[in-house]
UniProtKB/Swiss-Prot annotation:
Organism, as annotated: Arabidopsis thaliana
Pathway assigned in UniProt: Glycan biosynthesis; sucrose metabolism
InterPro entries linked to this entry: MFS_trans_sf, Suc_symporter_pln
Protein name, as recorded: Sucrose transport protein SUC7
Gene: SUC7
GO CC list: plasma membrane
Tissues expressing the protein: Expressed in anthers.
Main location: membrane
Signal peptide range in chain numbering: none
GO biological process, one term: sucrose metabolic process
Extracellular side stretches: 54-67, 122-138, 202-223, 298-323, 380-402, 465-468
Family according to the record: Belongs to the glycoside-pentoside-hexuronide (GPH) cation symporter transporter (TC 2.A.2.4) family.
């Protein structure tokens, strides 16, 4: 979920780069670009994870209400793995450097997870799963294991990559901004490539060996996408780790290694936190309660509600479902393009609107309206199928409406990935609190709501007929409330 992780890594950057290895000066820009390019490989995999894996696990027989529990690994690893990797990366004395061992380990874990996910159906079949059975339990277990390893691996990769850029910048503010700008650029490249691959329905023809007795066309496409993902990641990682030196670190007598561990600082900060920061945490938490149901089930909504397919139906229904999934991946690609363009204009728009809190409040209204409009698009699609028949594809207008919602949601998503972190920095500066600590506390307001949604959205959807709309409506309400709170109580 790297869009989800992208700005949480700022906590890691601040923490890790603060104890950089002594360098003669900033490294050449070409070396920073080489390290930043790893983000393209990371985001390619995240894009596939966000667009294809929730539908795929349902094709393996998991009921609609359960995939959200598998997604729990995202916030859990964001809460535990990412700070832990940062902590130990700061203190790594390996002769290969502080960052390279963690980056290499993360890339290898991604490769392992991709094999487990892509070949889950094949491994499950060889272990006794019956192809004609609706639930392939062994494949589901292997898939879930690979899914969790993938989340852990991505969190192992991202923090050290950003910290490596901080080390290479050697404290130069302009170089640091430039390095992070390149990292964001390659994230956008990876997103677009990943969603484009996910939207292409005939990718398996390039890798014909991916289609097997246990692995149908959708499975073979997924497998092919992940082959491209791991190839890209391994190539850019090997080039960066070979080309860019990571000097061995030796702890100094006056280093901060013996200070309170980061988690202890975080929990201690809640005791002394002032009202402006509490208000920021409330708005952020509501914002992520609004976002997470859609991020979990957006492509499933396209396949299930808009296209009228069924992951557990006959071949025709599964084909409809798969068509919707691929169109949903196209929508996510449009979302990423709008997000990237919007990110470039945030500062200017914020000034014209009179401040960050007004901009955040305004785009949360857009978020609420777009989530509510999924109900209208769904009803129009259902009405069309009642008239034209249950196997009828959605009209061009319905499809365009759904894709427009995906694209428009790139606007509030860009704000969600930037404004909360900027406000946390401003509040921490004005109150005298450490920026690293404030961003760490903000991270808690992101991952805890994600865990709550992961536990709750599946059962809520099941309670109202196993569709996606109940979770989206809850998200729309949370977005509206967060908008009101942003306008009225944020400093």
């Amino acid at each position: 979920m790297s869009d989800l992780q992208a700005n949480k890594d700022e906590t890691t950057v601040d923490r890790q780069s603060s104890s950089s290895v002594d360098l003669d000066g900033p490294s050449p820009l070409r070396k920073m670009i080489s390290v930043a390019s790893i983000a393209a490989g990371i985001q390619f995999g995240w894009a596939l994870q966000l667009s294809l894996l929730t539908p795929y696990v349902q094709l393996l027989g998991v009921p609609h209400k359960w995939p959200s529990f598998i997604w729990l690994c995202g916030p859990v690893s964001g809460l535990l793995v990412q700070p832990s990797v940062g902590y130990f990366s700061d203190r790594c004395t390996s002769r290969f450097g502080r960052r390279r061992p963690f980056i290499a380990t993360g890339a290898l874990l991604v490769a392992v997870s991709v094999v487990l996910i892509g070949y889950a159906a094949d491994f499950g079949h060889s272990m006794g799963d019956k192809i004609d059975k609706p639930v392939k339990m062994r494949a589901v277990v292997i898939f879930a294991l690979g899914f969790w390893i993938l989340d852990v691996a991505n969190n192992t990769l991202q923090g050290p990559c950003r910290a490596f850029l901080g080390d290479l910048a050697a404290g130069d503010a302009q170089k640091t901004r430039t390095a992070n700008a390149f990292f964001s650029f390659f994230m956008a490249v990876g997103n677009v490539l990943g969603y484009a691959a996910g939207s292409y329905t005939n990718l398996y023809k390039i890798f014909p060996f991916t289609m097997t007795k246990a692995c149908d066309i959708y499975c073979a496409n997924l497998k092919s996408c992940f082959f491209l993902s791991i190839t890209l990641l391994l190539v850019v990682t090997i080039i960066a780790l070979w080309y860019v030196e990571d000097k061995q670190w030796s702890p100094k007598a006056d280093s901060d290694n013996e200070k309170t561990p980061f988690f202890g600082e975080i929990f201690g900060a809640f005791k002394v936190m002032k009202r402006p920061m509490w208000m920021l945490l409330i708005v952020t938490a509501l914002n992520w309660i609004a976002w997470f149901p859609f991020l979990l089930y957006d492509t499933d909504w396209m396949g299930r509600e808009v296209y009228g397919g069924d992951s557990k139906g006959d071949d025709k229904m599964k084909k409809l479902y798969n068509q919707g999934i691929h169109v949903g991946a196209l929508g996510l690609m449009l979302n990423s393009i709008v997000l990237g363009v919007m990110s470039l204009g945030i500062e200017g728009i914020s000034r014209k609107m009179g401040g960050a809190k007004r901009l955040w409040g305004a785009v949360n209204i857009i978020l609420a309206v777009c989530l509510a409009m999924t109900v209208l698009v769904t009803k129009k699609a259902e009405e069309h199928r009642r008239i034209a028949g249950p196997m009828a594809l959605p009209t061009d207008g319905i499809r365009a409406g759904a894709l427009t919602l995906f694209a428009l949601l790139g606007i509030p998503l860009a704000i969600t990935f930037s404004i909360p972190f900027a406000l946390a920095s401003i509040i921490s500066s004005s109150s005298g609190a450490g920026q690293r600590l404030s961003l760490g506390v903000l991270n808690m307001a992101i991952v805890i709501p994600q865990m709550i949604v992961s536990f709750g959205v599946g059962p809520i959807d099941a309670l109202f007929g196993d569709g996606n709309l109940p979770g989206f409506v809850v998200g729309a309400i949370a977005a509206a409330v967060s908008s009101i709170v942003a306008f009225t109580v944020l400093p």
